[in-house]
Structures are given as C-alpha cells and as structure tokens.
Amino acid sequence: MKADYITRESLLPPYLAYPRFLLGMNVRLIAREVYIILLDMAYSGTDVRIDSHGRRYLTFYNKTIAEIIDRTPSTVAQTLRELEDAGLIEKKLISRSAPYHVYVKLPDGEDV
C-alpha cells in the first residue's frame, strides 16, 4: 500500500465509526471490531429491517461477517455471544432455517 501525507486538500477515506464508549468496555478487540461493523450495517446496510416497535435489526449469516473480518463463522458466533453478554446486541431466533434477527444496541444516553 502506498501512503501519502495528509494535506489541507486530503479527503477522509471511507471509514467505520468507533464509538468512544467501546474504549472503556471489557470486551475483546475482535468483539469491538464486529460491533463496529454491525453498527455500520444497522445505519447504512442493505440487510436492515424495522420491527413493529420501530427498532432496526439486521438479518445475516455469520459467514457474511466472517468474510469481512477474515475469520471463521464459529469465531463470529463466539464474538456475537460475547457482545450479547455485554448487552451490545440482542439476537432473536425466528426459525431454524432463517438467520437470527440481530438488534444492535447503544448504551443509555449514547448516540452515534
């Protein structure tokens, strides 16, 4: 990768938002990475749905996230459990043949 200096004319490349509250959370780095990707998907992704309460949720297979972060689907499953235990996501099983509905949550008082 070729790198260049930042100047006044430099534009910010595509990026993912890293919420400050994650800095103080006791979760692994990969969990933070997956949460950031899910948060980005929840705000700008094509797999976003809205439930009857007006809450956004994602529908995806672990393989989708695994390909983004270059890890295995089982690593993603473990990471999603960690995020759920931390209260940052909520998973709802709709049926065995469909992907989970994953709600990405923000701590009370936090906005993106």
Task: Tell me what each language-model feature is.
Residues 108-112:
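Short, amphipathic alpha-helical interaction segments positioned at domain boundaries
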Residues 19, 106-107:
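Residue-level signal for threonine
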Residues 1-63:
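Short recognition helix of helix-turn-helix/winged-helix DNA-binding domains
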Residues 42-106:
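Winged helix-turn-helix DNA-binding recognition segment
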